């Protein structure tokens, strides 16, 4: 598969370089008996910033999962970004999941909004409305509205979003990154049919969240 991003996300390169230099210096001056813990830390940092290619389903009405993680909510809720009632599906990412975000559908971005906020545990419901977050609202060619919200967590303190209003997105396209544990909420039209359940492990792009 042609994936236009390195398998280790660019967002992690500075962290990996720092961890590698520290491990090397401690190994050189103190030996492996002391440095092994720092080599383990380097391995953890490298695996955290991995960003592998994923197969993308071709089903026309499929809404793809925007992130790796575990489903923590499937419910009817108000979408405050598109001002409507919606089907809300939430994905919680722990520190061992891939943390890049990918577009759930093909469409054009009608809105991008950033909100400063708290850093509560991203697995709890109130993180959706109280934590730092960034929302993109996507309009599909069929006139359906899909909202994808990046939410910072207890450890995550940096949301990165690389798209702007008016730009097109294709399903599976990488559009953002959240560092060190977080959550993504997806709001869909009320009539959408969920294909996942609470507690299920999901993968970015390759898991179908719902059908429009």
Swiss-Prot record:
The keyword ATP-binding does not apply. It holds the Pfam family PS_Dcarbxylase. The modification Pyruvic acid (Ser) is found at residue 182. It is found in: Cell membrane. One of its GO terms (molecular function) is phosphatidylserine decarboxylase activity. InterPro entries: PS_Dcarbxylase (IPR003817), PSD-A (IPR033175). Binds 1 pyruvoyl group covalently per subunit. The record marks 181-182 as: Cleavage (non-hydrolytic). It comes from the Bacteria. It is a peripheral membrane protein. Its cofactor is pyruvate. Pathway: Phospholipid metabolism; phosphatidylethanolamine biosynthesis; phosphatidylethanolamine from CDP-diacylglycerol: step 2/2. HAMAP family: PS_decarb_PSD_A. Heterodimer of a large membrane-associated beta subunit and a small pyruvoyl-containing alpha subunit. Belongs to the phosphatidylserine decarboxylase family. PSD-A subfamily. This is Phosphatidylserine decarboxylase proenzyme. It comes from Paraburkholderia xenovorans (strain LB400).
């Amino acid at each position: 598969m042609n994936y236009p991003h390195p398998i280790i996300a660019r967002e992690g390169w500075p962290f990996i370089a720092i961890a590698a230099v520290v491990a090397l210096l401690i190994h050189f001056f103190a030996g492996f008996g002391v440095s092994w813990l720092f080599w383990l830390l380097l391995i953890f940092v490298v695996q955290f910033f991995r960003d592998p290619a994923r197969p993308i389903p071709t089903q026309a009405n499929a809404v793809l999962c925007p992130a790796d993680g575990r489903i923590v909510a499937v419910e009817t809720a108000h979408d405050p970004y598109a001002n409507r009632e919606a089907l809300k599906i939430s994905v919680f990412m722990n520190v061992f999941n891939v943390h890049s975000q990918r577009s759930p559908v093909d469409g054009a971005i009608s809105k991008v909004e950033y909100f400063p906020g708290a850093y509560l545990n991203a697995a709890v419901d109130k993180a959706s409305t109280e934590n730092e977050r960034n929302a993109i609202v996507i309009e599909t060619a069929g006139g359906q509205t899909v909202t994808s919200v990046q939410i910072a967590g207890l450890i995550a303190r940096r949301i990165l979003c690389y798209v702007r209003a008016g730009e097109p997105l294709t399903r599976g396209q990488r559009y953002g990154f959240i560092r060190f544990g977080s959550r993504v909420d997806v709001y869909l039209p009320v009539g959408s049919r969920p294909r996942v359940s609470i507690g299920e492990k999901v993968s970015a792009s390759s898991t179908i969240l719902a059908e429009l």
